[in-house]
Design a protein with these regions (language model features):
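Beta-rich, blade/repeat-based domains predominating
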Residues: 1-8, 12, 38-52, 84-103
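Blade-level signature of beta-propeller repeat domains, shared across WD40, Kelch, NHL, RCC1
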Residues: 100-127
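Beta-propeller fold detector
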Residues: 29-34, 75-82
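Conserved beta-strand positions in repeat-built beta-propeller and related beta-rich domains
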Residues: 11-15, 56-60, 110-113
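Short loop/turn segments that connect beta-strands within beta-propeller blades
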Residues: 22-26, 68-72, 122-126
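Hydrophobic, well-structured mid-protein blocks that either form specific transmembrane helices
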Residues: 1-37
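Structural signal for beta-propeller blades
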Residues: 17-19, 62-64, 116-118
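Loop/turn-rich, solvent-exposed surfaces of beta-rich toroidal or solenoidal domains
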Residues: 39-73
Length: 127
């Protein structure tokens, strides 16, 4: 549950807090609270840094949030409800819990505990 930018390791602890660590000493440098327009965004989990933003799964939900790393503000919510219905696997699955972004192609991949597949998704702006 860690990612990095060019300067720091960035870690979540399952709450709304992102902790920035010095990569050499592993000592905390700063903490940022993640929030949306209503309240603190708790259960932040599974971080991925890409193109100046942090993407995080919200534990036990089908949401991925796009976070401003400086302020902690949630800039977008990506709702993946229904993604499993595309598999028709009939197997028991647990929760969304995997995000990866290929830096070369900018493609996002998501999966979860006991998911039968890895999904490649394309992000589009909601109109």
């Amino acid at each position: 549950r860690m990612t990095h930018d060019d300067k720091h390791l960035i870690m979540d602890d399952g709450t709304a807090t992102l902790t920035y660590l010095d990569p050499t000493t592993l000592k905390p440098v700063k903490k940022v609270q993640v929030y949306d327009d209503k309240d603190a965004m708790v259960y932040i989990n599974e971080l991925e840094y890409s193109e100046g933003y942090i993407y995080a799964n919200v534990w036990t939900t089908n949401l991925i949030v796009k976070i401003d790393p400086e302020t902690g503000k949630v800039l977008a919510k990506i709702d993946l409800d229904g993604i499993l219905s595309m598999t028709n696997s009939g197997k028991q699955v647990d929760v969304l819990n995997g995000i990866a972004i290929d830096p070369a192609t900018k493609k996002m991949y998501v999966t979860g505990k006991y998911y039968p597949k890895l999904f490649e998704i394309k992000l589009v702006k909601k109109e």
